[in-house]
């Protein structure tokens, strides 16, 4: 597939799905539809599991074995792409074990120095992100893999979700965030754009998609696990 065709396909697909909430694991609580508005309701902090990793060597903080198990599953399950209910259950169990085993270094934390970072997706249960990773995987003929990132700056109160496709095109959803307590972060989308790479070189603005919250249920120096207002789980590693 040449660059022009890849750009056009990405643009077409994202425009068709522009009402899809593309924030890996931070979307409105209602899962049956992808509407902008969020119905007000109680938001219990239920644990719906997730995982982590894509690279070896992240073994400090909390139980090394529990963390390694999460990272291994994340890699085996290809970041969650095409995962089965059984895969999800296995990952959830591994994450629960990680949370239960966490030591002082793996406590949930929204501290600025801990949360502020560029985080690369290791595993997610969030369907919209997985759709993009499956539709445009990259990694063919020497091309890089499509990657997803969460870029957080607590001091400036911003969060950016970004999917970078194999040809350099990226899809970005920007949000403002507020730290609610030592675990929970609320967010509201402010803007979204599809930035096409060469030879198209164009930016297609898209509407923002609502608001929600996520809980950081595990954080250490190189990995973070979050569970959100839609019941999804996200595992990211520090980039």
Model-derived features with residue positions:
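N-terminal mitochondrial targeting presequences
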Residues: 22-28, 47-60
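Generic detector of short, well-ordered, non-transmembrane alpha-helical segments enriched
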Residues: 18, 46-48, 115, 220
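Generic recognition of cysteine residues
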Residues: 6-7, 50, 166
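A short, compositionally biased N-terminal segment around positions ~18-40 that is enriched
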Residues: 39-48, 89-93
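Soluble ligand-binding/transfer domains with enclosed cavities or grooves
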Residues: 53-239
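N-terminal chloroplast transit peptides
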Residues: 1-42
